[in-house]
């Protein structure tokens, strides 16, 4: 480890940790809610547990899309905060409310008519009905969840990431007893089973939304921004267009990534339960570890945007390198843990020795994959700070769908290049496609950073 290099970026790394740690803990709390739903529904029946899994496979991509649109706000708000244009922040948040209302309608309709795709999944009618009713219950919390994200983006943009962490943990504490009441039928309530998870989640989303709004209303710094001084602000087409121009590529890129992993599971399903189980264990482990670089990437967006708003592209560049140094340092630790404890990690999920052995083998690829994943997440965060999001979409589409999917299918399911190697082939493809993405995004980052300072600032002024 180059300790001289660490000391050079010490202040920036310290600030990145301060901002990213609450984001990480909030993500862990959010994922814990899904885990609690699965475990508690599983105690009713395997059908209820499966219904939640199926419902989540429809719900999550749609929520990621809505959330991706709103991720245009943190770089916008952090830029305005850094440039001292605090009076313009409230307008962005109010227009974010219109964005929430606008996207909630099509997403809500897709969820309401979820029975159509469920019919094509060839499952038991009881499971299909439970998944539909679970999604319909979740639907009531859709606007609240997106509104929560809108006000979370306000707080993130001004470097206040702790409120979301605290509120998400409070949501987890509310979620578990509500699950208990609605799933098992306690305190006079009927036993809803899997549907009870949907009811509980909808209530929790509203509770967290109201807590976040209350915090934003009462916090001294945010009151000075006068977000709530005007109850109704009409939609501003110019502002909404700018937010969509930033947010839509992020939303589509996130959906493409989610769809890639979903499609991989489908392509592996004919190969048998053992292979699918080993793949799922590796995917679940990688998804947990992914929260580390994702949190650093989100913190990087905030600090890079703020530095650029303050008129200091050189400081933004320095923050970017500090974020990469921090991300790769964390990745060395997580990769070593993955390698040396891969059998223990696999045994957390199953007791079948064959599945454990297969998963342990795949986790070696997952350890390698973490380095490329970290680089592409952190560099993506840097580019979002520069409000350069279209390129992220193009690179994601090319790397995942032009390279990743065909290569994974060729190696995993055919004998065209080598005798088919099942799940291992798809994980090799993940490593290759993410490495391409990391490389191409890094080239774009270098190009942005090589621009003349005035050219960078003029470009951002046009986008603000």
Curated annotation (Swiss-Prot):
The chain crosses the membrane at residues 16-36, 51-71, 96-116, 134-154, 164-184, 194-214, 248-268, 288-308, 321-341, 348-368, 391-411, 423-443. One of its GO terms (molecular function) is antiporter activity. Its main location: membrane. It is a multi-pass membrane protein. One of its GO terms (cellular component) is membrane. Belongs to the multi antimicrobial extrusion (MATE) (TC 2.A.66.1) family. Keywords: Antibiotic resistance, Antiport, Cell inner membrane, Cell membrane, Ion transport, Membrane, Sodium, Sodium transport, Transmembrane, Transmembrane helix, Transport. One of its GO terms (biological process) is response to antibiotic. It is found in: Cell inner membrane. Multidrug efflux pump that functions as a Na(+)/drug antiporter. Confers resistance to norfloxacin, acriflavine, doxorubicin, ethidium bromide, tetraphenylphosphonium chloride, daunomycin, berberine and sodium deoxycholate. This is Multidrug resistance protein HmrM. It comes from Haemophilus influenzae (strain ATCC 51907 / DSM 11121 / KW20 / Rd). Disulfide bonds: none annotated. CDD domains: MATE_NorM_like.
């Amino acid at each position: 480890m180059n300790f001289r290099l660490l000391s050079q970026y010490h202040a920036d790394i310290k600030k990145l940790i301060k901002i990213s740690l609450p984001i990480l803990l909030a993500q862990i709390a959010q994922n814990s809610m899904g885990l609690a739903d699965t475990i508690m529904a599983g105690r009713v029946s395997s059908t209820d547990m499966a219904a939640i899994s199926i419902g989540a496979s429809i719900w999550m991509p749609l929520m990621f899309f809505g959330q991706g649109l709103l991720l245009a706000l943190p770089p916008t708000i952090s830029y305005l905060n850094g440039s001292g244009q605090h009076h313009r922040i409230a307008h962005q948040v109010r227009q974010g409310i219109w964005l929430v209302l606008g996207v909630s309608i099509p997403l809500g309709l897709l969820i309401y008519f979820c029975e159509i795709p469920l019919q094509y999944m060839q499952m038991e009618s009881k499971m299909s009905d439970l998944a539909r009713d679970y999604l319909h219950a979740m639907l009531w919390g859709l606007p609240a969840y997106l509104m929560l994200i809108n006000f979370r983006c306000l707080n993130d943009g001004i470097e206040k990431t702790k409120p979301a962490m605290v509120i998400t943990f409070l949501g987890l504490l509310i979620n578990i007893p509500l699950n208990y009441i609605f799933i098992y039928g306690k305190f006079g309530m009927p036993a809803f089973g899997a549907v009870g998870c949907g009811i509980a989640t909808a209530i929790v989303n509203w509770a967290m939304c109201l807590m976040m709004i209350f915090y934003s209303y009462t916090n001294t710094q945010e009151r000075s921004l006068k977000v709530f001084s005007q109850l109704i602000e009409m939609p501003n087409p110019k502002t909404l267009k700018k937010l969509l121009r930033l947010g839509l590529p992020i939303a589509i890129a996130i959906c493409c990534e989610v769809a890639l992993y979903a499609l991989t599971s489908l392509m592996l399903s004919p190969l048998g339960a053992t292979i699918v189980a080993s793949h799922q264990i590796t995917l679940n482990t990688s998804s947990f570890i992914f929260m580390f670089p994702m949190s650093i990437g989100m913190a990087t967006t905030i600090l890079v945007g703020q530095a650029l708003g303050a008129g200091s592209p050189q400081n933004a560049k320095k923050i970017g390198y500090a974020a990469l140094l921090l991300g790769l340092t964390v990745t060395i630790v997580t990769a070593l843990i993955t390698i040396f404890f891969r059998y223990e990690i696999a045994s957390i999920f199953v007791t079948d020795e064959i599945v454990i052995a297969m998963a342990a083998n795949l986790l070696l690829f997952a350890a390698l994959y973490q380095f490329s994943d970290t680089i592409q997440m952190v560099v993506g965060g840097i580019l979002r700070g520069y409000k350069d999001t279209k390129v992220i979409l193009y690179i994601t589409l090319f790397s995942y769908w032009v390279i990743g999917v065909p290569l994974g299918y060729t190696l995993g399911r055919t004998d065209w290049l080598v005798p088919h190697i099942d799940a291992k082939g798809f994980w090799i493809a993940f490593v290759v496609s993410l490495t391409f993405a990391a490389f191409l995004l890094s080239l774009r980052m270098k190009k942005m950073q090589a621009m003349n300072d005035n050219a960078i600032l003029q470009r951002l002024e046009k986008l603000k």
